[in-house]
A protein has these predicted regions:
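Transmembrane-helix signature of polytopic, membrane-embedded enzymes
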Residues: 93, 98-123, 140, 159-162, ...
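Short acidic/glycine- and proline-prone juxtamembrane loop motifs at membrane-interface regions
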Residues: 124-138
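Membrane-embedded, lumen/periplasm-facing catalytic core of multi-pass transferases
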Residues: 39, 384-453
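Perimembrane helix-loop-helix junctions
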Residues: 1-3, 156, 188-221, 361
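Membrane-lumen/periplasm interface segments of specific transmembrane helices
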Residues: 211-282
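Extracytoplasmic catalytic/substrate-binding loops of multi-pass membrane glycan-assembly enzymes
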Residues: 27-42, 51-71, 78-81, 235-243, ...
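Hydrophobic, aromatic-rich transmembrane alpha-helices
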Residues: 94-102, 277-324
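Transmembrane-helix motifs of polytopic, lipid-linked glycan transferases
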Residues: 73, 82-107, 144-148, 305-311
């Protein structure tokens, strides 16, 4: 029987990513804002355009394109369904990692499989299935780093020093590589390093483990981001462009942090209890509504554990550790540190999805400790089941933007009436850079209005490049569909006036563009030098 259980478990772990790919085909094609803005464009900008165009994807033009390289080539040459299946397969690799994380805390395979399955089908994770968003694509690296860190915390940590140091370094390396692919994942990597400081070893050994993990994280970050940071620094003046530009002072971005602070909590109390607030008001942390009760449930259990620890300490007049094992301390401290960094810098829910995947494992650990050492297992089991059932019944998946399937992921038909080579000044508030790769390679695109303001240096460079083109157009998504964009035509000084042009609306051309079956009419209007 045990042999059959082993084989069935192994089959489930191996087959799950393949099955997850088929599940993605029933969710429809991804057509989210980020895809239309930069996921498809950025690899083209680096590999084909050689960074000649200026900010077509707004500030996201400068993101590390390494994670999107496979998507770009696949979307250009494969069917949309094949692309989505491949994306979901990679996302499904988190399942076996979650299983092995759960196995650190339970000997029951069925419980570990259940925790992994619930985690990968949680609201945030499942909303991104088959989507090119990087939160779930980098999750296998972040979760893999956590798993290696947990292995380093096993009892042999008190003996085999070289093995443990190697595991700690590997944990940092894998997690750091994931953070380099998507910088918003760095709270997980920092927390992985810090968590080694709380295990029950002499301080010097804990420090050595944290140092080894930190060195591994730096190497991993350099492997995935180093090339791009160097490219940004040498060509554009900052390795983190456009962020932290008050430090790096690149002339190609405003001298500020250039971060999105709209979703940050106000004050310490809001930050500490943010899971409860975003559960009641999902738009605090996401542009769409969603519901996932596991995060506030986990915080509630953690608060009860703290209250219990304080009460026991006061009664016995001696400190009693909340968590008995190094693995428990490691994963709980990692969770808390990740959350605190995230809520202070980002507070965007989808950046926390790898932690959401872990919540069912964490709930099992924390609920067990809540009732320890009395061991009333029926009560603990009932509480855990109640949380899981409540989460499943109330779960609401975030609609990131889906469409029916088309043969090709993206279709753009460039009208023959546009004279090439031409320059296009991109305006408006909508994402449209995905259309740029379908234009002739000798055309020039420059964003003069968007979510980042062109600096004087950027304006000067655009003006210089425009001199080489006799035919110049304004480029935007149908302005009549967006009143704020349509108002540009009636402004006394519209954005293109800065570059010495007036618009001729009589010669406007609609460019048929489509993500899946969703059409997006991109318009060009000729500009005349004033």
């Amino acid at each position: 029987m045990n042999r059959w259980a082993v084989w069935l478990t192994a089959a489930a772990l191996v087959l799950f990513p393949f099955v997850y790919g088929f599940v993605a085909l029933h969710r429809g094609e991804d057509a989210d804002w980020d895809l239309m803005n930069y996921h498809f464009f950025d690899p083209f900008w680096v590999l084909v355009n050689h960074q000649h165009d200026i900010m077509p994807a707004q500030l996201q033009t400068y993101y590390n394109p390494l994670l999107d390289f496979p998507f770009y080539f696949a979307a250009r040459h494969l069917s949309a369904r094949t692309v989505a299946y491949g994306i979901a397969f990679v996302q499904g690799l988190s399942f076996p990692i979650l299983y092995f994380i759960a196995r650190v805390f339970t000997q029951r395979r069925v419980l570990a499989l259940g925790a992994a399955g619930l985690g990968i089908f949680a609201a945030g994770a499942f909303s991104e299935i088959g989507s090119v968003m990087g939160d779930t694509l980098t999750a296998p690296f972040l979760l893999g780093g956590i798993l290696l860190g947990l292995y380093a915390c096993r009892p042999p940590a008190h003996g085999a020093r070289r093995r443990v140091l190697t595991l700690a370094a590997a944990a940092g390396l894998v997690s750091g590589f994931g953070s380099g692919l998507k910088l918003s994942a760095f709270p997980f990597t920092v927390a992985t390093v810090i968590a080694f400081l709380v295990i029950s070893l002499p301080f010097t050994r804990r420090l050595a483990l944290a140092f080894a993990s930190g060195c591994g994280a730096v190497v991993g970050l350099l492997l995935s981001y180093g090339w791009w940071g160097y490219e940004l620094a040498t060509r554009w003046g900052s390795p983190l462009l456009p962020y932290l530009n008050q430090v790096f002072a690149s002339p190609y971005a405003p001298l500020s942090s250039n971060t999105d602070a709209r979703r940050l909590p106000h004050g310490v109390l809001q930050a500490l209890f943010y899971p409860f607030l975003w559960t009641a008001q999902p738009l605090r942390t996401s542009p769409q509504t969603f519901r996932e009760l596991t995060m506030p449930a986990l915080e509630a259990v953690l608060l009860l554990l703290v209250i219990k620890a304080v009460a026991v300490t006061a009664h016995r007049r001696a400190w009693r550790p909340i968590f008995a094992s190094d693995a428990e301390r490691f994963i709980v401290v990692l969770t808390v540190v990740t959350y605190l960094i995230w809520v202070d810098i980002f507070a965007i829910y989808r950046y926390l999805i790898p932690l959401e995947m872990l919540t069912f494992v964490l709930l099992g650990v924390c609920v067990r400790r809540l009732f320890s050492p009395l061991k009333p297992w029926p009560i603990a089991a009932c509480l855990l089941v109640a949380i899981i059932v409540a989460s499943l019944v109330t779960e609401r998946i975030d609609n990131i933007g889906r469409t029916a399937w088309a043969d090709r992921y993206i279709t753009v038909l460039v009208p023959a009436s546009i004279v090439h080579p031409a320059a296009f000044l991109m305006v408006g508030s909508q994402p449209d850079a995905y259309a740029v790769p379908y234009f002739p390679s000798d055309d020039f695109f420059a964003r003069i209005q968007g979510n980042i303001r062109p600096t004087p240096t950027v304006e000067a460079r655009i003006k210089k490049d425009l001199r080489a083109y006799s035919h110049v157009y304004v480029f935007w998504v149908d302005p009549n569909a967006f009143p704020t964009d349509a108002a540009l035509l009636t402004q006394p000084r519209p954005p293109w006036a800065t570059y010495g042009f007036t618009v001729s609306t009589s010669g406007c051309i609609a460019i048929p563009a489509r993500i899946g079956t969703v059409g997006q009419s991109v318009h060009t209007c000729p500009l005349v030098r004033s």
